[in-house]
């Protein structure tokens, strides 16, 4: 079975075709804000300008390989409303034109499913950290339940905000990671875990404050150590609570080596296995939507056009996981 999937919840517009074995084609057009963070309408404008050429390229690629597309998947949410609508409109038209089923995919679940596909993880506790989301999830009674999540901003958003406040370019995460490597000392910053949830906005403010008095390298390092320790603590507690013997890291912040290392150590100490997908499957990509659409279609789930409206606040636990 071949499924074409379109991702476009935020900055990255990406379309891909996958089958059960592999990614066949993937193409992307990335929106980079001229200054500051993402502007939802500008991002949507970017997506509508690029979606035609992008889809034409992917469909032509399929034709050249003699592939017949059996379904169209799209990121239905969560994400920025204007971006989601652009993608959903294109997906509906394409499904009608090709006369194949349409399937709306939960973006967070897609991060998890492609991670499992590409690493061989079976039933992990998942730390999903990106610019828009920070959650700890695990499958229980047929749904991806959220065990812990941020009470305010996501960890990626916190890193990007801090970066902006000290004059570093967007996205801040990679630059902070680089600077942190040259640090000499740890500066205490507020560590906030409440029950199973974490909070990052106070940390961003405290770090910006500290950057006026201390070396930027030391602040970047301390910011990472503090924020990541919070994430690792909650992931470990979710593993204990949900009795999971595996952990997996997904989302754009998952590219951070230090975060991966901290999770790996925690897993080693618990005698659990740690899974880290390749970088290209960690951030937002079309293949994750195509692949999740494929497993959904194979389990008999599709989305009729009349219920294919976008869902900017779509939660993972709203989806019944029939394919696991
Ligand atoms: P989502 O829609 O799932 O919320 P997103 O639109 O934020 O995703 P991602 O690619 O998943 O996109 O994540 C982008 C975030 O990842 C940014 O906040 C960026 O700073 C962060 N990031 C990227 N590389 C690193 C890194 N090496 N270390 C820390 N953070 C990173
Ligand atoms: Fe994402």
Swiss-Prot record:
GO terms for cellular component: cytoplasm; EKC/KEOPS complex. Its main location: cytoplasm. Required for the formation of a threonylcarbamoyl group on adenosine at position 37 (t(6)A37) in tRNAs that read codons beginning with adenine. Is a component of the KEOPS complex that is probably involved in the transfer of the threonylcarbamoyl moiety of threonylcarbamoyl-AMP (TC-AMP) to the N6 group of A37. Kae1 likely plays a direct catalytic role in this reaction, but requires other protein(s) of the complex to fulfill this activity. Substrate binds at residues 128-132, 160, 173, 177, 256. Binds 1 Fe(2+) ion per subunit. SUPFAM superfamilies: Actin-like ATPase domain. It comes from the Archaea. InterPro entries: ATPase_NBD (IPR043129), Gcp-like_dom (IPR000905), KAE1/TsaD (IPR017861), Kae1_archaea_euk (IPR034680). Keywords: Acyltransferase, Cytoplasm, Iron, Metal-binding, Transferase, tRNA processing. Its EC number is 2.3.1.234. It comes from Methanothrix thermoacetophila (strain DSM 6194 / JCM 14653 / NBRC 101360 / PT) (Methanosaeta thermophila). It is an enzyme of class 2 (transferase). This is tRNA N6-adenosine threonylcarbamoyltransferase.
């Amino acid at each position: 079975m071949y499924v074409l999937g379109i991702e476009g919840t935020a900055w990255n517009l990406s379309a891909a075709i996958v089958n059960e074995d592999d990614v066949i084609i993937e193409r992307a057009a990335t929106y980079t804000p001229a200054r500051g963070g993402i502007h939802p309408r500008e991002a949507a404008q970017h997506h509508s300008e690029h979606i035609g050429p992008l889809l034409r390229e992917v469909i032509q690629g399929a034709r050249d390989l003699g592939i017949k597309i059996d379904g169209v998947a799209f990121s239905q949410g969560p994400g920025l409303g204007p971006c989601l609508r652009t993608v959903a409109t294109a997906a509906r038209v394409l499904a009608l034109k090709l006369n194949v089923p349409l399937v709306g995919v939960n973006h967070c679940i897609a991060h998890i499913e492609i991670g499992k596909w590409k690493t061989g993880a079976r039933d992990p506790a998942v730390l999903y950290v990106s610019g828009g989301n920070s959650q700890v999830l695990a499958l229980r009674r047929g749904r991806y339940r959220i065990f812990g999540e941020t009470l305010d901003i996501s960890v990626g958003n916190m890193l990007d905000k801090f970066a902006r406040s000290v004059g570093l370019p967007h996205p801040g995460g990679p630059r902070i990671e680089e600077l942190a490597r040259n640090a000499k000392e740890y500066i205490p910053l507020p560590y906030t875990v409440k029950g199973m949830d974490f909070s990052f906005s106070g940390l961003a403010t405290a770090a910006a404050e500290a950057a006026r008095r201390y070396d930027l390298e030391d602040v970047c390092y301390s910011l990472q150590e503090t924020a990541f320790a919070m994430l690792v603590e909650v992931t470990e507690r979710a593993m204990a609570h949900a009795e999971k013997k595996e952990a997996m890291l997904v989302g754009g912040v998952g590219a951070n080596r230090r975060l991966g290392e901290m999770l790996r150590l925690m897993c080693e100490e618990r005698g659990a296995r740690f899974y880290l997908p390749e970088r290209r499957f960690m951030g937002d990509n079309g293949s994750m939507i195509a692949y999740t659409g494929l497993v959904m279609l194979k389990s008999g789930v599709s989305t009729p056009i009349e219920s294919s409206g976008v869902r900017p606040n779509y939660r993972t636990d709203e989806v019944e996981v029939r394919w696991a």
